[in-house]
Amino acid sequence: MEAEESEKAATEQEPLEGTEQTLDAEEEQEESEEAACGSKKRVVPGIVYLGHIPPRFRPLHVRNLLSAYGEVGRVFFQAEDRFVRRKKKAAAAAGGKKRSYTKDYTEGWVEFRDKRIAKRVAASLHNTPMGARRRSPFRYDLWNLKYLHRFTWSHLSEHLAFERQVRRQRLRAEVAQAKRETDFYLQSVERGQRFLAADGDPARPDGSWTFAQRPTEQELRARKAARPGGRERARLATAQDKARSNKGLLARIFGAPPPSESMEGPSLVRDS
């Protein structure tokens, strides 16, 4: 009897263990599916580019206007060039305007927490009025929005760092060029002052200057002849010059063709 009861207990435990294993497997599968769904639903930020920014339009304005469509993250506006800023400041100072000069921006980038909202905003608000109210100062300005596909904020940071580095290198090159021009001018002035001082020097009564000129052909031949083994070459060169001059003189006297033509004539006759 005891053996039969033990066999029954063993047979009852086996299906229980099988059901527990199946439940564990189902729970693990559900957890993996939830993790996969969570990874699919992960929010990816998107960036919208602003190609036109009206005067006196600030990041706070764009944040307030676009926050109605979705959560806005980081906002960056590119300031106008320093040269343009100086010209505007000078014009404002010359015109005697009551309002002081305010810095303006040329372009901007807005980050949305969800790229789907960024796409929707760029597609729906493009070429529409910025201000909805009649008294809004930006009512007659239009949105110029473009969604940047696969563009992240790190790309923008790298791009801005690259532009900053290029600007610094250009500034260094301009400063170096200006320094070279200034040094050359100062050297020229000092040289002229030395010349003027030397003109009134009593050690030079004539006040004449001597300048080194390039050696002539005769001087070069004389130098070559002075070298070991150069006399023979000089003699050969002079002999060749004399022969050429004699041939040219005979050709002028007798009306004969030059040596090159006289050599080509018989060859043509033979060929014919």
Curated annotation (Swiss-Prot):
Gene Ontology CC terms, in alphabetical order: nucleolus; nucleus; transcription regulator complex
Ranges of Basic and acidic residues composition bias in the record: 1-11
Spans annotated as Disordered: 1-38, 198-272
Cross-referenced InterPro entries: ABT1/Esf2 (IPR039119), ABT1/ESF2_RRM (IPR034353), Nucleotide-bd_a/b_plait_sf (IPR012677), RBD_domain_sf (IPR035979)
SUPFAM superfamilies found in the cross-reference section: RNA-binding domain, RBD
Nucleotide-binding in keyword set: no
Stretches assigned to the RRM domain: 46-142
Primary subcellular site in the record, as a coarse category: nucleus
UniProt modified residues of type N-acetylmethionine: M1
Keyword annotations of the record: Acetylation, Coiled coil, DNA-binding, Nucleus, RNA-binding, Transcription, Transcription regulation
Record-linked Gene3D superfamilies: 3.30.70.330
One GO BP: regulation of transcription by RNA polymerase II
Function: Could be a novel TATA-binding protein (TBP) which can function as a basal transcription activator. Can act as a regulator of basal transcription for class II genes.
Oligomeric and partner information: Interacts with ESF1/ABTAP. Interacts with IGHMBP2.
Family: Belongs to the ESF2/ABP1 family.
Name of this chain's protein: Activator of basal transcription 1
